[in-house]
Amino acid sequence: MMYINKGKRDILIFPQFTNIGKIENIRKQYDELYEVLPPHIPLAFPFESSMSNDELKNRLMQVSKSLAPFEIIMSGVSLHEDKKANTNYIFLDVMSGVKELKMLHNKIYETVLEHQTNFEYIPHITLGTTEKDHIEFELNDVFKTVITKISIEEIGENEESNVIFEINL
């Protein structure tokens, strides 16, 4: 495994599903980061910044003031091609809560990180990768929880997640 994100930070949600074990079982087979990073919904992808952790926390607290906890429902899987890496990502799809997640993502990039993204944000949990053009398993379960906080992590030596702080919604 190539460790390309070591030392970077990212902003994400660690959802607390009662049936999260089903997600973990699939990730164990398809996701090389299974052992070092719990299932998560990315809000800001790994980034480098000279901004201190305190400043980052203060900016995120300003964003979170306008937000309340919200429910998400996830179900279904989809493939998303990464032409640069010559692979397909397997996503667990968000069915409800998409609007809130996209708004949060956009606010983070616009007001916290102060730049625009040049891609369409698709809220999801990455279940893994495959070189195949189809998914070889079924996942018909529904995953439901209330999102109450966002996490900021620093990515460690072996791509492990080191949560620096969390912000309550």
Where are these regions (language model features)?
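Histidine-dependent nucleotide/RNA phosphoesterase domain, centered on the 2H-phosphoesterase fold
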Residues: M1-L169
